[in-house]
Each structure stands twice: as structure tokens, then as C-alpha cells.
Amino acid sequence: MNVQPCSRCGYGVYPAEKISCIDQIWHKACFHCEVCKMMLSVNNFVSHQKKPYCHAHNPKNNTFTSVYHTPLNLNVRTFPEAISGIHDQEDGEQCKSVFHWDMKSKDKEGAPNRQPLANERAYWTGYGEGNAWCPGALPDPEIVRMVEARKSLGEEYTEDYEQPRGKGSFPAMITPAYQRAKKANQLASQVEYKRGHDERISRFSTVVDTPELLRSKAGAQLQSDVRYTEDYEQQRGKGSFPAMITPAYQIAKRANELASDVRYHQQYQKEMRGMAGPAIGAEGILTRECADQYGQGYPEEYEEHRGKGSFPAMITPAYQNAKKAHELASDIKYRQDFNKMKGAAHYHSLPAQDNLVLKQAQSVNKLVSEVEYKKDLESSRGHSINYCETPQFRNVSKISKFTSDNKYKENYQNHMRGRYEGVGMDRRTLHAMKVGSLASNVAYKADYKHDIVDYNYPATLTPSYQTAMKLVPLKDANYRQSIDKLKYSSVTDTPQIVQAKINAQQLSHVNYRADYEKNKLNYTLPQDVPQLVKAKTNAKLFSEVKYKEGWEKTKGKGFEMKLDAMSLLAAKASGELASNIKYKEEYEKTKGKAMGTADSRLLHSLQIAKMSSEVEYKKGFEESKTRFHLPMDMVNIRHAKKAQTLASDLDYRKKLHEYTVLPEDMKTQWAKKAYGLQSELQYKADLAWMKGVGWLTEGSLNLEQAKKAGQLVSEKNYRQRVDELKFTSVTDSSQMEHAKKSQELQSGVAYKAGNEQSVHQYTISKDEPLFLQARANAANLSEKLYKSSWENQKAKGFELRLDSLTFLAAKAKRDLASEVKYKEDYERSRGKLIGAKDVQGDSQMSHSLQMSKLQSELEYKKGFEDTKSQCHVSLDMVHLVHARKAQHLATDVGYKTAEHHFTALPTDMKVEWAKKAYGLQSDNQYRADVKWMKGMGWVATGSLNVEQAKKAGELISEKKYRQHPDALKFTSIKDTPEMVQARISYTQAVDRLYREQGENIKHHYTPTADLPEVLLAKLNAMNISETRYKESWSKLRDGGYKLRLDALPFQAAKASGEIISDYKYKEAFEKMKGQMLGSRSLEDDISLAHSVYATSLQSDVNYKKGFEHSKAQFHLPLDMAALVHAKKAQTLASNQDYKHPLPQYTSLAEDLRLSCAKKAHKLQSENLYRSDLNFMRGVACVIPGTLEIEGRKKASELISESKYRQHPHSFKYTAVTDTPNLLHAKFSNQITNERLYKAAGEDARHEYTMTLGLPEFIRAKTNAANLSDARYKESWRNLRAQGYKLTIEALPFQAARASGDIASDFLYRHDFVKERGKLIGPQSVRDDPRIQHCRRMGQLQSELQYRRGATSSQAQFHLPMDMVHLVHAKNAQALASDHDYRTQYHKFTALPEDLKMAWAKKAHALQSELRYKSDLIGMKGIGWLALRSPQMESAKKAGELISETKYRKKPDSIKFTTVVDSPDLVHAKNSYMHCNERMYRSGDAESLHRYTLIPDHPDFTRARLNALHLSDKVYRNSWEQTRAGSYDFRLDAIPFQTARASREIASDFRYKEAFLRDRGLQIGYRSVDDDPRMKHFLNVGRLQSDNEYKKDFAKSRSQFHSSTDQPGLLQAKRSQQLASDVHYRQPLPQPTCDPEQLGLRHAQKAHQLQSDVKYKSDLNLTRGVGWTPPGSYKVEMARRAAELANARGLGLQGAYRGAEAVEAGDHQSGEVNPDATEILHVKKKKALLL
């Protein structure tokens, strides 16, 4: 059925609602008046320009009487005068010869379409911004009233008002062109387009839009070629001529102003209301408006330029008008005026009478109000007026002269046209003139019929065609098509693709070598070019033959190696150290000596083992098991204990009771040290505060300041022992660099060797900078000048007493370092270690005894026996004391201030030693000792004395001797031959330098034409050539081919289209729908009958029924059921039936599933598939890649069911081999290929002739001399012949002797045996408070002791049994409490330095999967790095360094072998010889006068810069200038305040002071009743009290019912709570805690610090930060930039150094250290910047 679209709405019109009028098809509902929207019929419509109107609104009947002073008439008059009047036409016609501008440009055509969208967007933007600052004050009653009035009027009224409003003499509002443009704007509007879309979707689409469908639609719009090119075409032709001043823009803007309701009423209110007068008034108003609009100076300037032919476009009326329109449309200008006008009304709510805005809104409402409108109508209804005499009629007649198109054209034809139309004008000029006259949109559309005859105006540009084209996508066929039909089109001219093409051309090796290929045959390379000579020399250096030749010569000379050489002895010693056999041998020797004394601790361990022994336990059990009076609740407690130990994590972590180790054992201390070094937690603890802090460049000012501040406030550094402070010499500090440089300058050998030859051959000018610098250096290094200044200083005199600080400090340091002094003090103070006559004299022991008595059950029972007969005892005192003690044990404060628990003698050696250690650790005292050295001279590093002193210090260092081998860290020395060679290799491997060198060489080099590389390059050029590629394609394309409609690709595409088509699918589905169940009843359907029968067979009820019937009959073959079951099982398990399931039941032939299965089997059938190919047998071979083959491949891929159905994860990534990246990688591989490089070197090696006098040749000779073994031994003999004096008292001998004693195992054991008896201080077990305490605790915890006490007291009825429950509750609380979990050392007595304890902590930290992976969370989503890149190599190296596997491997598995003749070492030696300054200068002296260096040579320039950088004079001058700048450092400066505050924080005195203040706040109650905790404990004690329980039991035992709170149930509940993981993890709500308690605050703070959520909350701001797809344009650009930066030697440090220097300069001066807050602010800023 042919359904035609409606002329108004565009939808299809069916016969029932069809009207055919005005040569068009309409819906009945759409056939309405254009003005009032009244429904029309065939009989009552009036046609005007093919649009229907009612009789009342017929545009032809101009019967409406217009009021003369309406704003519309004034606008009508102003509009033709200002924009399209006669004067402007004259100006335009005069300017036509000067300016030629095509009015049909893309800008003009696009402007009307864009204008409504742009206005709408700008309007809503302005509305949103204006909304933002409106105050939220209370609404005024007037405002509320007006809002309601506006709502009642509504938008429909204003729409109806808009259309009849313009029914005056100006027909712009009702012209067909205006209505058509308005309709086109509505159609083009995205809002109008989308309105009703959801309803239409629900009506016409069966499937709701899924997210995938919506996403694909959005993607299709993004990928749409039409959308993309449409925007691009609109913007493509724009140059520097702004769209704001085009006539189309002016017309559209003016039309918007005319159509604007607000503008209409504003203009009317401001100018016209209340005025009445003749036409002169209108003229005056017009003149005034023109004067206001264009200014006074415009006519004068216009008259000046009027007669001139060419005048600037800046003063044309069109330009002025456009400028004014631009200002009106400009958002910036609008906001400027708006901000000026913004007054109090915007920020305060005035009453309605005072608010000007409200007054204006009220007046507008009155105008819009229908009541006001009808009032005037009622008042004027009864008057009769002669229309011809009214001023309005005269005004209209006057206006009609100006608005008449005939009059306008008459003036134009009479006055203007004859000036320009003549013989000399060609058609282009006439066309330009005609285009200029079409500036008015109204005149343009009125004159459209004339233009279409004269000029070729294409139909595709008409509004109706554009509208129809916009409606094409809305058609049902296009709208309902499947997504799969939309094909992806690659837009070839997108900026990204264009940029990629440019990049590919830039990266193209062919383009790169194109110029070279043209010019390479035009150069002749001389034989003596330095580069050529250097290449030959390099070829010799890299020659394998030469290399082996030198090695053979060296090998044949031999060398002398004695058995007592230092290297052999060191190797033996290291081998013994690393030897597993030696290690085990020493271990076996010392194994029996570890427990060589009757140690009281061992006895204690044996005693504890007996107590915990099962045998001992059973002995006691055998004795007591026959007694009936055992309290039954003991079993429950025992069970609860066992359950708690099983469920508790604490016992899992406390494995330390298994054995006892001596704390002074050497192995224990050594293990402690090793574990401290290995501790991952301690290592990472220093870095915890840096979590989340941004990345900073190493070495920057802020980073160094932050490091220093971190060291100052570090608790670890403050508390650490003296021997852990390491002295590290900063190798790259200015002092060290200066010292190195001075050493080189002072070296007489190097100085004379380099200058000896040039002294007599060179004349230097006196004012040469180097000469002046040498003089200055000589003055600086002059011994005489140095001593003269010293003598001058000495003459002034100074006083140095024997009691000065420096002497005293030196003495003190000597005494500290002296072993004799140390042992002397130790011997003196050895007897003072205990310092108490008896236990009562020692406060600590007394306190321990008192604690043991308090905790002792026996003591408690003794006291109870004394007081049990007294009724008035206050039991809460015991609880109070116990609670205090428990609080002390549980609180963290008491843990940290442990030194308050005992009183130490002031003469105690430990106290003195601690004071001395703290004094040494004090940073202030440490720096005070160094202050006197400021300004002192320096010692040249590398001199003999310094090296001897260093070596001696290392040999006698106890710390270095005792440290673990794994603690030795690798330090890279920057100026080693390896590092220098690495730098040289890096510069050689840099692509940029390589290409620069290649560019230099390639113009002097003539390669042979048949080289393999050249042939390969040509082949590659042919392969990569786009021209060759397109040429072959063009040839193939020109050959032509025949493709019929019945060809395979077409048929396959049709079939695939039908398969994919949703419509076809549904059509087939509808056809087959009635055939699915083709039976009249269930019995007729074989499938259903089979299912019912199978169900009945499987039914247990039916089975049993049949069994009941047949069980009495003997002849039933019982094996039938099993047989059927086996068959069924076989069919289920059989693979054959699985593949061919159809024959098992009978199906209808027209069943949909059956036909689908047949189709599937046909597709899967191998025989059918191959039978199709039988007709092709004997057909000739088809070349792969032809059009037919590719077409068939594509068709088979399209119809492939497996590919269509496959999972997205099965798609594999395929690399395109001809991408620029892969081509670049291939070429880079060829360039960096060592084999090809050497092959090219071998070919080129025999074609060079070396000149003998070249500097490189001379340097090679010098290098050969330097590498010569004969020369080396000769110089050694000469040096040895000079001799030197080395006495026995020399420092090295003394150091060696001392180190021999230290390293001696015999002396070590001798000292150990001497000291062995001094390890345990007390004479017996009773003198050792620790062991006494352990014994006491063992007795308390002993089951035997407990049972003895129970036996002695079980017959007494008055014993309060609730104490057992209270102890149990305390223990359970302690186990469940997280507090006690963290401070678990109070529950048992364990040696804190126990090896197992530290090892268990380490093992748990290592086993924690969460902690391990939490460090890696920050790395999620980070991209990959190319292999062999510097970052990847450094990461590998770091991984090897921190590798746990490599770290933990046995020492004997690490084999160190130095191959003396390895290429690396030989290469390093050669490189070192190359880098040697002395040899370089000595070898260069001969070639100095044979070579002329270009003054601006890069090497020369770089040498000058290096000389400037290394210049001591410049260095000192810059230092003097910096020092002269000075700075102000007051006592109230922020660094001082920060240091003071940090000192107070770290101060132990402040800490104790704060502790003493808070100590009284911990309990803070007058009695037990005020303390909620104690009340809680008492209540718990009463509830758990056995005494109370027995009282109640005695009352209720005669009653049969059992209470729910019986002890068994309570105990089970308690056990469940203890065993429950929930209560274990949430222990905090169980106790009642004082909120002001110090321990609670501390715990809260600790939990906040440990909170993973809070830690990760800092990272939430980075959530949602997008990722960049690999391979995209920006990623490739960034990667290329990184490669270029690496190639130029730029690191990240250089990139960020400037920004950090600026920020550092902003925050503080160069000499003031920042405080902590400033550091945090700077870090936050940098994190934001990064």
C-alpha cells in the first residue's frame, strides 16, 4: 500500500483521515489555519502561498486597522530605513565595485539554521547563570501574586496572542516564508525532534531500548559520516570574516527581536504608550532613533567618504550595524552592562513598591493581562469613526510607501540601476550586484520567483528540500532498520587521521632517506677525514682478531702470584665464611657449650615443663578422682579455657614458651640484629607518613628540606643507639667536588705531563682568561700566601686553654673509644649493679613481691580467713586496687613510661651509660662539637695519609666487623670506569646523536651500489611505497571483473541480511507460530505423550502402585526395570546419541524446531559441505588475494554461525604489520642489530687508508703504551727503587695487629670464656627478681597448687566462690579485648628479646596477603613499559635487589667468578684509558699544532662551558655574591618556632610532665559507687557469684522447674561469646570505659592511624579518573615525546626542576628552613599540579 506523507507533520496519511487540497496531502487534524489553528474543511479554507487559512485570517484581506503608534509600526518604519532603506541600497550599490562577496557562501546558508539553536543555548546558559546569584530570601506577597498570575495566563495564551498580533499592514509575521522558516527551525530543533520519541518507541518498537542499543546509537552518531561532515562543512569555509556581521545574521536577529514578546512590550512601554500625533511625530522619533543608533558623527563622516570609490569597510553602514548587532549578541558585553546594573536588588529583597524590577514586571503583566486588554476594548466599543480621516490611515498610507516592494524597486530602477548596468559589466559583476540586493530576507523570498528564472538556483538548497531531507531519517524504513545494517565508515579527513598520516610520513624511513638517495652519489669523501680515520680506528678496536691478538700476547707473559698474597688469603677467608661445612663444624663444636651451666632459667623451664606435663597432671587426677565433692563448674571452666585457647588468635601468635634462651647469648644478639635489619615493618614504618604524598624530584630543595625535617622529628632517629648512627660522605657535595678538583689541580705529575711539551711551543697573551684563572689558582694554592695569611692571623693572637671545649671533647671521645678505659670503668662499677642490701631495699623487688602477694590466691585466702567473721569489711577496696593495677597494666601510657616503676641509684653504671648515650644522640650537642670546625681547611681525598687512616678505621671498626654480610649495601661510584663507560655507551646508543652523526657522515660517504644493506633498503622502499601499492591496485582495478546478481557474494549477503534482519526473523516467526503445536490433544502429540509416559515411569508413586499389584506374582521379570534404566542411562551418557538426538522421538514434519535442526545439521554436515565443492574439481587454481577470493572470504565470515555466536573474549588481538610503530621497530632492530653492524664494519674495514699523524692514531699509540704490561712493570720498578720508610710503629701495622686480634677466633673465645661467669648477676635464683616473679606466676597458674588450695577450703561453706568467676571473667575480658591483644606482654612472662617472638612477628607480616597486596593497589591500571627501556631495566634491578628469593638463598649457592680477560673488563680498561685526563693531554700535545679547530665547534663550545662550570674563580665569586646578600633570621622565625615545638614534642621531660598531669585523671572517683566500671565489675561478680547462686538454689530446689540462668547455660553463653569470631573482632562495646580516660584517647588515635578506610579515603578523589586507550593519538604522541626526551638526555628531574624552584622561591628565602605546615602545603600544591 502506497502511503503518502502529510504536508505538515510528515507522517503517513491513511485513506480514512486523508484530505487532498492545494495540490498536497493532509491529515484532517493537520489541515488547520496557520494563524489560529482552527480545523478547516474543503469548503471553508482560503489558500495563500499553498498554506490553508480561515476567512478571518486571510492575508489577502488587509482589513485590520492598525494603531499608528504601535511598536510594530515604528519597528516596521525603522527596519527598512536602517537595514534595507534606499540610502543603504545606494551605499551598497556604490560599494559593489569595491567589495565582492558571495552571498551564497556556506556561512550565510548555515547561519539561519544555527541561529535558533545558538539563541536557545545562549538563553538557557544565561538563565542558568542568572539563576545562580539570585538570593534565597523570603518571597514577597506581590511576587507570589504575580507568579500565580503568570501561571494562570500560561504559554498557550501568549502563543495565540503572537499570531494575530502582527495583522497590521506589515505582513512579515504571516508570510509563508516566515512560517516555513519557523517550521524548519522547529524540525531542526533537537528538543522538538526528541519530543514524543519515547511514546513513538513504545508504539512502534517491540523491544525496549537496552543500554547496549542506546550505546550503539550514540556510537553510531559519533561515527556518523554525515553528522561529522555536516559540522565540518559548515565550519570549513570560515576565514577571518566573522559570522556576526553577515546580512543573514542581521535578518535572523532582527526577526528574533520582532518575534520577541519581551522586546515588544519593552519598546511599547518605553516609547509609544500614551503618544498620539501626526506623521511628523513618527518622523521625529525615527530621526531620534537613527541619531541614537548611529551617533552624531556618522552623517558627517559618511558625507566625507560618500563620493570616494574605495573606502575602508570599518565605516560602512553595514559594518556599523553589524558591530552594534555583535555587541547586542555578545555575552561579554551583556554581562558587563549586567554587572554594572547589578545593585542591591540582586542581593536584598525590597518590597514591591521600591523594587524597580518588580514594578516593570507588574506593568508587563498588565499588558499581557487579558482583563486589561478587554477593558480598553469595552471602553472603545461604541464609537463610530471615519476610517479615512484617522491618523492611523494616513500613517499606514505613508508607511506603505516605504514598505511597498514596487515603490522600492521603482526607485531602484529609476535612480540606481542605470549607474552600474552598462556594456562593460560581465555576468559575474551582475550576479554580485544581484546577490547584494538580496540582503533583506523578506525581499529575497518575495523576489524568489524572478531569481529562479534568471539564475541557476539548485533545488537542493530550498527550505522545503532541506526539511524533507531532515525528515528522511525519521521514515519508518530508516528508523526501524537493524543496527547490524549500519556500516562503519572511516572518516579519512579527521584531524587525528590527518595527524597520523603526517606522523607516518615523518617517521617514514623512505622519506627520511629520499633526499639522501638523491644526493649520495654527488659526494666524494677524502681519505683523511677525521671521522673516517676514527671509524678505522674503531674498527681496529672492535676487531676480534686484534682483540685476541692482544690477549694472546698478554697471556704469554705470565705473572707471579704467591700463596700468601692478600687476595688469596681474603678469598680463603671469604670462602670459609660462606662455607656451609665450616659453619656446621663450628656449630657442632659450640653445640654442647650453649647450656653449660646449671642455669636457674633452665631449672625454671624444667619445672614449668613438669607442671604442664600430662603425666604429672594425671598423677594428681588419679589421687583426686574418687572424691565426690569436686565442684562441677571446674570442668566447665577447664573446657572454656581449652576452647578459648583453640579459638584464640593470641596463643597462635604466642609460641615463645617452647624453650628458654639466654638473653646474653651471642647468637641471640646476632639474630636480633639480623631480624632488625630484615624487618619489613620497621623498614616501611619510616615511609608510612609518606603514603599518599605526591612524587617529588630527587635532590630538589623542598625534598631535601622535608628529609631534614623528617630526620629532626623522627622518633626512631631520636631514640636510636649511638652505634647505629652511620657516617656517610656525600660524594657529590660542593666540598667533595672542590676537593677532587683541587687534588687534580695540585697533582704535579698530571700538571707537568700535560704542560711540559706545550710550555716551550706556545705563547699566551697576558689577558687570556685561562691565564688569569691560572694566576688566581696559583694565588689560591700558593703556600707562601697561605702561610702569610696564617701568620697575619697568628699575629693577632688568640687564647686556647687546656680546659677549652675542644680539648675536653677530644679527651672525652678518646676515653669513650678507649677499650682500656671502658673496661676500667666496667670493673669499677661491676659491684654496683644491684645496689641493694636485701629485697626490701630494692623498690622494684619490693613492688614485685607486693604484686605477687596481691595476685596470690593463698595470700588472698589468708586475708579472707582473718576477715571473714567481720561483717563490716568494705569489699570494694580490693576491687579498687585491682582495677587500678589492671588499668596500669592495660594502659598504653604505663607501657611507654616504664621507668617510673623503679628507683635507680644515681651511681648506677646503666644510668651513667644511658646519660652518655643520650648525650651522644643529642643533635644539638653533636652539632655543637662540630661548630668549632667551621671554616677549617680540608684534607685532600686520595692522599696517602687519608687513605691509610680510612683503611685503619675500617679494619678496627667493631661495627663493620660484626655486621651481617647482607647489611652491606651496594653503592655506585659515579666516576668509576664502568659508570663512565655506561654514560659513553648511552650517548652512543641515543638515536638522536646517532642520527646526527649519520647526517654528518652520509654527505662524505660513497657506498657501493650492490651492498646488501642498499639492496635491502631498496626492497623495503618498494614494499613500503604507497605509490607501488596503489599502482598494483590500479592495474588490478583496470582489469575489470564481472559480478552478476546471482553471484555467491550477493547471495551470501542477502542470506546474511535475512538472517540478521529482525523483520525477517519476526515474519518467519509469525508464519511458524501456528505450527508449533500441531495436535488436537495431548495424546496426539508424540512428544508430550512421551514426556508424560517418562514422568509416569520415573514417578515413585506409580512405581510403588505397580509393585503392589505385582509383588505377589512370581513370574514378573524384575530385570526389565533395570534394563530400561540402563538403556536410558546409556542414551544419556552416549556421545553418539548426544550428537544425533532427533531419531529418538517422532516429531511433526512442519515443526519449527525440526526444520531449524535440519538447517543446522545441513550447515554442520561435512559431507554436504564437501558435496557442494564437487563441481569445482579440476577448476584452475585461484591466486589468493584476488577480488573474488576476498569477496567469498568476507561473505563466509558474514554468514559464519560460529563467528556470529562466539564469545567476545575469544577475539584475539592481531597486530597490523604495516603500522608506523611496527615498521619503526623493524627498522630500529635493523639499525641496532650488532651482527649487521659488524658485517658492515667488516666490509668497510678494508677500504680505508689511515694517515699516521691523526690525533686518534696518536691516542691509540698512547693507549697501547698505557696498556703495555712491560711499561707498567717498568714504572713499578722505578717507583719501588725510590723506596720509602715504614716502621713497625706505623699506623697500618698497628691497625693490622689490632685487627688480627679482633679477627682472631681464639682471642674471641678466650674473652668469651673469661666473661662467661659474669653473665648472670645474682648468686642464686632467689636473688633474681625476674626468676622469682616467674616462679610466683608459675605457682599461681599451676593446676596442682590450685587443687591444693581447693582441697583445703572445699569443706568450708562460707568460702565466696565467686572469686573464681571473677578471675575467669577478667581473663576472658583480657583475651577478648583488643587493648590487651595489643599489649599482650602482661599476661605471661616472656623474654622480650626472645628469638621466636620477633620471628613470629616477621612471619605473620610476611604471610599477610592483605598487607602484601595493599601495597600493590596503587599500581592498578598502570600501563606497560617497553622491554629493555631504562625504566624497565631499573625496575628489574630494583626487583633483584629487594627479591626475597635471592636474599634468602644460601651463601654457597652464590658463586663469584671474575673473568680477567672478559670483554667487559678489557673494554672498561680501554675506556678508562680513553677517559684518563693525563694520558689524553700527553697524547694530545703532539697533535695540538697539526689541527685547526673551528671556533664554534660544539666540542669547543662545550669545553668552554665545562671550564666555566668547573672554574674555581666563578664558583667563589658566586658564593661571595650569595653571601653578600645576607638574610634576616630572628628568634621568632618560623623555623625556630618549629624546631622549638618539635624539641618539646620529642622531649622526654615534657612527656613525663604531661604524664604526671594526666595521672590523677585516670581514676578520678571518690568511691566505687561513682565509677561505672567498678560498678559493672561488682554487678558481674554478684551475678557470677556461686554464693548468691546457692542461696537462690536453696530457696528454689524444692521446685521442679529449672531456671534459664543456670550456670551451665550461662557458661555455654560465655564460651560461645568467647569462641565467637564476632565478639573477638568487636570487643570494644563490652566494657564500660570512662570517655575522658587517657588510654581510650590513645587507642582512638591509634585506630585512626591504622584505619585502612581513612587511608584510602585520600585516594577517593582520584576515582573515576579516566584511562587513555593504548595506541590512541594522544598516547602515541606522549610516547613519542618521552622517546624524544630520552634521546635528548632529558630526565624527569629537569622537567620539574623549574616549577619547583619557582614554588620554593615563593614560599621562603634560600636560607630559611620551612616548618612542617609549609612543607605540607607545598606537597599538596605539587600533588595538585601533578
UniProtKB/Swiss-Prot annotation:
Modified residues (Phosphoserine): 1081
Protein name, entry field: Nebulin-related-anchoring protein
Region (Disordered): 1595-1620
Annotated Nebulin repeat ranges: 63-97, 156-166, 175-202, 203-237, 246-273, 298-307, 316-343, 348-382, 389-417, 419-453, 487-521, 522-556, 558-592, 602-626, 627-661, 662-692, 702-724, 726-760, 761-795, 797-831, 844-869, 870-896, 901-935, 945-963, 969-1003, 1004-1038, 1040-1074, 1078-1112, 1113-1139, 1144-1178, 1183-1206, 1212-1246, 1247-1281, 1283-1317, 1321-1355, 1356-1390, 1391-1421, 1429-1449, 1455-1481, 1490-1524, 1526-1560, 1564-1598, 1599-1626, 1640-1664
GO CC terms in record: fascia adherens; muscle tendon junction; Z disc
Organism: Homo sapiens (Human)
Sequence ranges assigned to domain LIM zinc-binding in this UniProt record: 4-64
Tissue-by-tissue expression: Expressed in cardiac and skeletal muscle.
